[in-house]
Amino acid sequence: MMVDIAKSHDLFIIGDEAYREFVYAGEPLQSLGEFADAPDNVIVIDTVSKRFSACGARIGCIISRNKELMSEAIKYCQARLSVATLDQIASAALYDVGPEYFAAVREEYKLRRDTVVAKLKEIPGVICECPKGAFYLMAALPVDDADKFQKWLLTDFDDNGDTVMFA
């Protein structure tokens, strides 16, 4: 359905697939790049910093079968971007990690997700769905004003001396 809409309105579908290994429901993620019927409308992006928890590594990729888009992206990248040599060497090495790395990280994230969801569901009025992938979730909190609540968290609340805030 998304592919049909994108094709009929000449739109792009952008898939950030940096967390594709972190799917908990048992079904593998179907990459947008697999949709052969919309080669000009699909863009897949990935990033080392998200995929491997390599904070600060400013290196990633953009993938598309749209030759015009890729030609323009390459021009921009050649003129504006420069990844540090050390980041390139370290990032290349990260792609040699085996599947056991992602299995261990996936299990840790799943444990954390399950804990957060269980604790949130103990709070009256909180509504949240259990995420099927990645490591973040959206929750509706029983507050009248989200801005005031966030300010209160930053100025008046702590958990054992630690500040608690929204990302």
Predicted regions and their residues:
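PLP-dependent class I/II
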Residues: 1-167
